């Protein structure tokens, strides 16, 4: 009899220990978001709406994709994200009826979401966490850790971050010793081909270009300025990277711009279409963007 009681007690203790170590949504979480507001969750978020493509990519990267019940219109990566309910574009009036119907326990917003939108969602009684855009790859890792904490995926995030850090280190090892840099014009938008938009100081694109071994000819101008055709001609970049290729801009079309036929990049065949999402979305695919830019600018270092 004593032996039966002993084994029953031991089994019960083991079961309790096992239950205690398993992921669970229980346990209050209190964090301060980037608007300085205390955000309280009853447990890890299980029904999440992402209001930005970068956040959607982070959620899936840390293993929380199955907890995403809504995404804004342009969240198209990873492909599985397209199976999540589309709540519409965030630059328009929010479809609050649809958002409420999804019964989210957490809505993640970023700098692409207007403060008025955050307030609108809060006024509906929804929990809204606001995240500033990171300014470095290292800060992006912090966003991954934050999202993992909110969703209960710390272990998966740690593994993903370690892999990303190793890839960045591999690029840094090859690029940092270089004493020279190739000049680059990165085109963001040529809706007005006479004054195309580019990325300047303080942008992810400039940060990644420089870390990949390039020099951005617009790095002394803040934000996303327009540059005249003459300004680009005067700078004569060694490379022109077409972040607007998906909108129909081609190496052939830019060669038709007045004066551009004599640019070094055009004459040397160094006008390259590029997937802008890899460098404009502050999420884990920034590392993909860094690798692709480094291979583009310094292919001889990445031949293996």
What is the predicted role of each segment?
Residues 2-6, 10, 17-56, 150, ...:
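Bacterial Sec-exported substrate-binding components of ABC uptake systems
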Residues 52, 111-112, 133, 188, ...:
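Short secondary-structure boundary segments
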Residues 73-77, 195-224:
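Alpha-helical, coiled-coil/dimerization segments enriched in small aliphatic residues
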Residues 95-112, 126, 228-245:
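Proline-aspartate-enriched helix->loop->beta-strand connector
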Residues 116, 132-146, 179-204, 248-249:
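Extracytoplasmic ligand-binding site segments that recognize negatively charged/polar headgroups
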Residues 34-36, 87-96, 112, 134, ...:
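Short helix-initiation/N-cap motifs at beta->coil->alpha
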Residues 139, 145-149, 158, 239-304:
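Structured C-terminal subdomain patch of bacterial secreted/periplasmic proteins
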Residues 47-102, 106-111:
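A short, structured surface patch at a secondary-structure boundary
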């Amino acid at each position: 009899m004593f032996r039966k009681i002993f084994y029953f007690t031991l089994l019960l203790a083991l079961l309790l220990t096992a239950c205690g170590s398993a992921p669970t949504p229980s346990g209050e979480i209190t964090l301060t978001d980037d608007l300085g507001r205390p955000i309280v969750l009853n447990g890890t978020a299980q029904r999440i709406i992402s209001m930005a493509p970068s956040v959607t990519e982070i959620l899936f990267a840390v293993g929380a994709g199955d907890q995403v019940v809504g995404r804004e219109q342009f969240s198209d990566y990873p492909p599985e994200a397209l199976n999540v309910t589309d709540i519409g574009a965030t630059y328009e009036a929010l479809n609050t009826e649809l958002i409420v119907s999804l019964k989210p326990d957490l809505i993640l917003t970023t700098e692409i979401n207007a403060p008025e939108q955050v307030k609108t969602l809060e006024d509906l009684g929804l929990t809204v966490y606001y995240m500033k855009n990171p300014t470095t790859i290292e800060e992006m890792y912090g966003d991954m850790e934050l999202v993992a904490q909110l969703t209960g995926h710390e272990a998966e995030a740690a593994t993903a971050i370690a892999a990303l850090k190793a890839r960045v280190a591999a690029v840094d090892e090859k690029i940092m010793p270089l004493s020279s840099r190739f000049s680059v014009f990165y085109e963001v938008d040529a809706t007005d081909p006479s004054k195309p938009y580019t990325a300047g100081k303080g942008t992810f694109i400039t940060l990644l270009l420089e870390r990949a071994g390039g020099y951005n000819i617009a790095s002394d101008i803040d934000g996303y300025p327009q540059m005249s055709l003459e300004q680009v001609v005067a700078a004569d970049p060694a490379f022109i990277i077409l972040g607007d290729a998906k909108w129909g801009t081609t190496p052939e079309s830019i060669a038709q711009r007045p004066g551009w036929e004599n640019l070094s990049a055009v004459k040397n065949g160094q006008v390259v279409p590029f997937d802008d999402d890899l460098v404009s979305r502050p999420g884990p695919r920034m590392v993909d963007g860094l690798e692709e830019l480094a291979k583009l600018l310094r292919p001889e270092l990445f031949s293996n």
